[in-house]
């Protein structure tokens, strides 16, 4: 392989990597929600229509397992594996524990986030429901760090 051919291959590889990264950035907020089986979890008073203010599944091992799976299917694409963000979306390990963190989580989970007509996070509340949302939050609580 000549230097010229090697250099051309390197430039082509860099161009492909740039296009792939750009496509990933544009895809942010364009997520098709994946169903979450929450039938093993206790029902929440109010169902999906009347969201409660605090996580009823904190520390519930079954909810944490369901939440981990649901996060991997629906959240990791933007927020990163194990809730460690690559910098595009908030790193959810730093989401406060307790009522203030619950409030922030529910607002974003239910309604998503958009600014100036750009969708940064689609709403998941109606599609996945309250039980799945709180299960994801229960799992996120196990990843909390203040460092």
Region annotations inferred by a language model:
Residues 67, 71-81, 105, 121, ...:
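The canonical Cys-X-X-Cys-His
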Residues 64-66, 80-110:
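Gly/Gly-Pro-rich "capping" loops immediately C-terminal to redox-active cysteine motifs
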Residues 27-36, 86-94, 111-144:
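Axial heme c-ligation environment in periplasmic c-type cytochrome domains
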Residues 2-12:
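Bacterial N-terminal signal peptides that target proteins for export
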Residues 35-70:
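Electrostatic cytochrome c docking/interface patches
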Residues 11-20:
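Bacterial N-terminal signal peptides
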Residues 22-24:
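N-terminal signal peptide c-region/cleavage motif recognized by signal peptidases
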